Amino acid sequence: MSGGGVFTDILAAAGRIFEVMVEGHWETVGMLFDSLGKGTMRINRNAY
């Protein structure tokens, strides 16, 4: 892999940062989708 070292390092670093972000925010995202789903269900129930 001659010449592609820097790009590979950047990709690896970006992947690690992304992993940390996903790990940190996963519960928040889950709670968000949970409340979003409940809200959608409530709206659907009221619509009919």
Swiss-Prot record:
Question: Where is the protein localized?
Answer: Chlorosome, Chlorosome envelope
Stated family: Belongs to the BChl C/E-binding protein family.
Q: Which GO terms describe its biological process?
A: photosynthesis
- Source taxon at top rank: Bacteria
Query: Which keywords does this chain's UniProt record carry?
Result: Bacteriochlorophyll, Chlorophyll, Chlorosome, Chromophore, Electron transport, Magnesium, Metal-binding, Photosynthesis, Transport
Q: What is this protein called?
A: Bacteriochlorophyll c-binding protein
Q: InterPro entries, alphabetically? A: Bchl_c-bd (IPR001470), Bchl_C-bd_sf (IPR038387)
GO terms for MF: bacteriochlorophyll binding; metal ion binding
How is this protein annotated for GO cellular component? chlorosome envelope
Name the gene. Answer: csmA
Coiled coil segments of this chain: none
- What job does the chain carry out? Component of the photosynthetic apparatus. The light harvesting B740 complex binds bacteriochlorophyll c.
Assign the protein's first listed, main location to one coarse class. Answer: other
Gene3D superfamilies linked: bacteriochlorophyll c-binding protein
The residues that the entry says bind a bacteriochlorophyll c are: H25
Q: Which organism is it from?
A: Chlorobaculum thiosulfatiphilum (Chlorobium limicola f.sp. thiosulfatophilum)
